[in-house]
């Protein structure tokens, strides 16, 4: 009887410790959920983070409720076993004591599962906070006429001038590759380019005049050859008729 009473006290203590652990885990999860909700409310994307945390909270709550119900069922069964053991002989108490050794192991397993679930819950919280951080807002423009406004205007002007000079330099380098020159000075390159373009223009005009004259001469030659061809054609027809008449006269 003393042993069974001790076991009963030990089980009651373990049951109380388990309830305390479950309660602490619930409190920790509720506190973490509140902190996460407050942090996420400052962001424009808090709805998704809150939904994710609520889903994890519901799952953890259901698991804890299932664990508590299983614990209550286990404690009820333990009470029934105690009442039955009081009416059994010492031999049966000895046999049942060997079977009760596995109960603390189950409780340790449940506590380990609760600890793992709490760690997983914290991991989901950290993941939600990482994924839904607010983006930094752009700084406001300086007021018109202020020193900062003038400074930015000067910098913008310098940037425009730099791009313009870079574009001009790129064009001059491309021009130096196209014209036959070995000069490296920009002014000389431009002067050479102007002279080269003028020569090309003069050559083009000369070629146009040359091609126009050649075209006229070719058309004149074609006309003369056509007239000569017609003349030869008529002479050939006259000769053919004379030959036909001579053949008929011989017959």
From Swiss-Prot:
Please indicate which superkingdom the organism of origin belongs to.
Eukaryota
State where composition is biased (Low complexity): 40-56, 117-126
Q: Which residues form a coiled coil?
A: 190-223
Q: Name one GO molecular function term.
A: DNA-binding transcription factor activity
What is expression of this protein induced or repressed by? Repressed during biofilm formation.
Q: Where is this region: Disordered?
A: 1-169
UniProt keywords, alphabetically: Coiled coil, DNA-binding, Nucleus, Transcription, Transcription regulation
Family annotation (Gene3D superfamilies): Helix-loop-helix DNA-binding domain
The annotated phenotype of a deletion mutant is: Leads to auxotrophy for sulfur amino acids.
The record's listing under InterPro entries reads:
bHLH_dom, bHLHzip_scCBP1-like, HLH_DNA-bd_sf
| Domain (bHLH): residue spans on this chain | 152-200
Its subcellular locations are: Nucleus
Q: What is its main location?
A: nucleus
- CDD domains named in the record: bHLHzip_scCBP1
Q: Where is the composition biased (Polar residues)?
A: 67-76, 107-116, 127-140
Record-level GO BP terms: chromosome segregation; methionine biosynthetic process; rRNA transcription; single-species biofilm formation; sulfate assimilation
The record's GO CC annotations read:
nucleus
Q: Where is the composition biased (Basic and acidic residues)?
A: 7-28, 77-105, 144-167
Protein task: Transcription factor that binds ribosomal protein gene promoters and rDNA locus with TBF1. Necessary for the expression of genes involved in assimilation of inorganic sulfate. Also required for the expression of respiratory genes and glycolytic genes. Does not bind to centromeres and is not necessary for efficient chromosome segregationas as does S.cerevisiae CBF1.
Provide the protein name: Transcriptional regulator CBF1
What is the organism field in this record? Candida albicans (strain SC5314 / ATCC MYA-2876)
């Amino acid at each position: 009887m003393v042993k069974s009473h001790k076991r009963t006290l030990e089980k009651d203590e373990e049951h109380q410790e388990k309830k305390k652990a479950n309660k602490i885990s619930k409190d920790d999860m509720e506190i973490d959920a509140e902190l996460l909700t407050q942090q996420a409310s400052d962001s424009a994307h808090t709805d998704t983070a809150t939904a994710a945390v609520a889903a994890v909270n519901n799952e953890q709550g259901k698991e804890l409720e299932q664990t508590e119900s299983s614990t209550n069922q286990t404690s009820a069964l333990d009470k029934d076993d105690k009442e039955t053991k009081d009416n059994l002989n010492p031999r049966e108490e000895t046999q049942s004591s060997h079977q009760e050794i596995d109960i603390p192991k189950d409780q340790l397993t449940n506590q380990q599962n609760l600890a793992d679930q709490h760690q997983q819950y914290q991991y989901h919280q950290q993941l939600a906070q990482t994924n839904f951080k607010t983006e930094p807002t752009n700084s406001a423009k300086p007021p018109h006429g202020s020193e900062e406004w003038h400074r930015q205007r000067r910098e913008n002007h310098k940037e425009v001038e730099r791009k313009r000079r870079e574009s001009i330099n790129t064009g001059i380098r491309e021009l130096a590759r196209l014209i036959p020159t070995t000069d490296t000075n920009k002014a000389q390159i431009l002067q050479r380019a102007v002279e080269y373009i003028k020569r090309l223009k003069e050559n083009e005009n000369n070629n146009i005049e040359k091609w126009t004259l050649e075209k006229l001469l070719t058309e004149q030659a074609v006309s003369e050859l056509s007239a000569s061809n017609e003349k030869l054609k008529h002479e050939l027809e006259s000769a053919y008729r004379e030959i036909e008449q001579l053949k008929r006269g011989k017959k």
